[in-house]
Amino acid sequence: METTASVVAELNVALGTDYRLVRQLTGGLQSTAYELTGGVVLKWTGDPAWAPRVRRAAELVRRARAVGYPTPAWLAVGTTAAGSPYQLQEFVTGSAPTLDQALARQVIEICELQRDLLPEDHDVSWSGWSHGVVFDGWDGVWERVQRYDGEAAELLARYGALCRPYRDHELPHHDLVHGDLNMGNLLAADGRITGIVDIEAAGGGARAYDLVALAASAARDGADAGVDELFLEAALRANGRAAVAVCAAAGFASVAEFVHTRSEQSQDMVNHGGRRLLELLDA
C-alpha cells in the first residue's frame, strides 16, 4: 500500500530530486497536501481515476497564472507505478482566512480573471454537470438527497422550484471554474489573498459556480456579515440568475450528500449555507 513517504521516494527517483517530507498541511479536501523541503508542496491521491483530471488541470493552472490568478505554480505532474497521480507545487505563504468584506472584494476581482479563459468547447463542463444534476439525474445525487430525512430534502425541493423555469436555458461554458472554491481553499497574509489552492477539479463552465460556492461557504463558515451577499451579487453580475440558480442547486445537492454521513454539526452548517442562498435569491 502506498504511503506519502513511498510516493516521495518514488518521485525522487523519477525526477532526480532529493525532497524530504516536512509536514502535512491543513486545508483542502480533494487530496491531502504535504510540505516538502525546498519550498515545494506535494499533493497526491491513491485514486488512479483522478490522473486524467490532474493532467488536464495542469494546463488550466498554466492559463490561469498567465492572467494573474494566484494559484501556486505546478512544478511537476506524474503518476506512481501504482497509477496514483501526484503534482508538485510551489509553496505559498498564508493561511485560510475568515473573510471580511475587503478580502471578499479581492476574491471577487480574482474570480473575474476566470472569464472566457476556456474559449474552446469541452465534452463536460461544470455548467453541463450542474444542469445534468438538477434536471437529468446525473450521478443520482439529486435523487439520493431527495430521500434524506430532515431539512436537506426540504431545501432541495425549494432549489428544484427555483430552477424549474431554467430547464431549457443554456448556461455559460467558457469561464474557468475552480470547482471547489470555499474559504478553506483560500490563503491570505497581511490583508491580501496570497493563494487559491485545491484546484485539481478545475474545468470550464460559469464562474458564477465558484462565486455561489463562496457565498455558501461564507454563510456557513463564519465570514463577516454581508460577505455572502457580496459573493452572490457578484455571481448574478457575472452570469445571470439562471446560472446562479442551477449552480447553487447542484452545489447544494453535492455538498449535502458529501456531509450526509458526517457529523450533525456539518450537516447543519451545510443546510444553513443552502438556506441562506435561497433567502438571498428570494426563493
Question: Where in this protein do the model-derived segments appear?
Answer:
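Active-site activation/catalytic loop segments of kinase-like enzymes and analogous catalytic loops
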Residues: A208-G240, A249-Q267, R275-R276
